[in-house]
Structure formats: structure tokens, C-alpha cells
Amino acid sequence: MSSRKKVMLKVIILGDSGVGKTSLMNQYVNKKFSGSYKATIGADFLTKEVLVDDRLVTMQIWDTAGQERFQSLGVAFYRGADCCVLVYDVNNSKSFEALDSWRDEFLIQASPRDPESFPFVVIGNKIDMEESKRMISSKRAMTFCQSKGNIPYFETSAKEAVNVEQAFEVIARSALAQEEAEEYGGDYTDPINIHDTTERDGCAC
């Protein structure tokens, strides 16, 4: 195993109240689903150890309240995030239309060093509902994601555990890449040439 230090990845889940943020988190971490979650007050988090490319990392997944009156709690929760997950309900057009403001809210509150490259993942949840109730097509959601810099997009059912594992695999990978970029980026903006052309003593083992 690698002797590199253990990595803690902070992931924030945002979206309107009732879109299934808590359900997604619980399905991924605990493999459980409940149809009777109460609205999250403030924020709550769960942790899960996962392997990303043979590297063991701990994901700290924050589930934040979707109610507007709790959005002011943001700064403390958003700071230090390595990835932001934007969740909407495919059967609720209002929750989809709110994604833009959730994304903007996150970028303002979290103040990532490089907002343009900060990793987001979009999840359209509740695909287990009747097709006739669906209000947001996959095409419309994908068009939105492409317009925001090709954000990865997943359609999930937290209830039936559809695509949840796959979505969080990409979330973990994106978060780790962001964490490493922050760790090694420092305050340098110019690329560093890692190929040293000078001769070195010793064997090339």
C-alpha cells in the first residue's frame, strides 16, 4: 500500500428541498432507503472510505438543507469542498431550474481558487417514478451540463439504488483530482516542468 498520507475529501450535496439529497447519501453510504426522511435542518454529513485508483480515501459527504432560510449557513459548510453535487428531481421542473442558482451560491460561498475548473456533478434523481410524471428530459439536462463546461451527469433512483454507486464513483474521482490540484498547486499559476534534464549520480533503479 502507498505510504502517502490519508486523504479526506469533502463533498457537498446541494439542491432544493425534497429532491432526495439525504436519500442519495444514505443509499450510497449505508445501502438503505427510507421514504420518511424529515427535512434536513442546517447540514449533516456521513463518511465513507473508498478506493480511488487503488488509493484509500475518506469521503465526507455533506447533506445541506434545501430550504432558502438555511442557505445563509453556507460559508462554513462550503469552504474546503473538493466537489459539489447538484441534485434535482426529474419530475420537478422548478428543482431543475434552481440548479443554476445553487451552483452560483456554491461558487460565491466556497470561493474556490479556480472556479472555472472546480468539479461539479449533476444528478437527476427519482427516475423510478412513472415516465408520464417526468418533466425534465435527459437531453435538456445534458444540454445544461454541457453549457457549464461538460459537467458529468447521472440519472439516479435513490429508492432503487440505480446509478448511485456509479455517480459517487465519479464524484470521488473528481474530488480527489481537485484535492491533489489544491495540494500541489500552491500559489503557482505557471505549469512546472517536472522533467529535469540535468545528469544525476547513482543508478536508475
Swiss-Prot record:
InterPro entries, sorted: P-loop_NTPase, Small_GTP-bd, Small_GTPase
Gene disruption phenotype: Displays highly fragmented vacuoles.
Example GO BP: regulation of vacuole fusion, non-autophagic
CDD domains: Rab7
Residue window of motif Effector region: 37-45
Pfam families according to UniProt: Ras
PROSITE patterns, per the entry: RAB (PS51419)
Inhibition and activation profile: Rab activation is generally mediated by a guanine exchange factor (GEF), while inactivation through hydrolysis of bound GTP is catalyzed by a GTPase activating protein (GAP).
Keyword Lipoprotein found: yes
GO MF annotations, alphabetized: GTP binding; GTPase activity
Domain of life: Eukaryota
Lipid moiety-binding region (S-geranylgeranyl cysteine): C203, C205
Residues holding GTP: 17-23, 33-40, 66, 125-128, 157-159
Biological role: Ypt/Rab-type GTPases are key regulators of membrane trafficking and intracellular vesicular transport. They act as molecular switches that convert between GTP-bound and GDP-bound states, and regulate virtually all steps of membrane traffic from the formation of the transport vesicle at the donor membrane to its fusion at the target membrane. In the GDP-bound state, Ypt proteins are predominantly cytosolic, solubilized through the interaction with a GDP dissociation inhibitor (GDI).
Protein name: Ypt/Rab-type GTPase avaA
Lineage of producing organism: Eukaryota, Fungi, Dikarya, Ascomycota, Pezizomycotina
